[in-house]
């Protein structure tokens, strides 16, 4: 092989290797920063279309309603544990070691982000509560089968109550 051809081959192999290395590092970075959204039923039973369950140690987001009567606070720390459920009957325990949002209440919708532990609990690093009585995050509303519609205000006057 002449020196010119050898130099071209070396350059081509180095270029292909560099592109492969950059692509693999990029995919690894994207995969580690990916937060997939699951409902409690999907965590328990798997996704409806594929049956895929989240892996232990995977960073996920879970959305649903806080189960009434499930909240347990540790009086000596900020640690709190509560259950999140959806309309399909799935329920997941969530543990959180920080201050809960002011709007957090039992029976209301939340989205919690964290890591799934071996015992099936979500060790949350962030908990988001809904804004007002009508708001629900679109992912949670879609997963729970609810439909967002704009309120229809009529131009009629309210009847007198006297």
Swiss-Prot record:
Residues holding heme: 131, 135
NCBIfam families: PRK13165.1 (NF009638), PRK13254.1-3 (NF009729)
Biological processes per GO annotation: cytochrome complex assembly
General function of this protein: Heme chaperone required for the biogenesis of c-type cytochromes. Transiently binds heme delivered by CcmC and transfers the heme to apo-cytochromes in a process facilitated by CcmF and CcmH.
The keyword Cell membrane appears for this protein: yes
Positions with biased composition (Polar residues): 153-162
Protein's UniProt name: Cytochrome c-type biogenesis protein CcmE
Ranges for region Disordered: 142-162
Recorded family membership: Belongs to the CcmE/CycJ family.
Ranges of the Cytoplasmic topological domain: 1-8
Main localisation: membrane
Keywords, in A-Z order: Cell inner membrane, Cell membrane, Cytochrome c-type biogenesis, Heme, Iron, Membrane, Metal-binding, Signal-anchor, Transmembrane, Transmembrane helix
Record localization: Cell inner membrane
Protein topology in the membrane: Single-pass type II membrane protein
An example Gene Ontology molecular-function term: heme binding
Pfam family, one: CcmE
Organism the protein comes from: Shewanella baltica (strain OS155 / ATCC BAA-1091)
Periplasmic side: 30-162
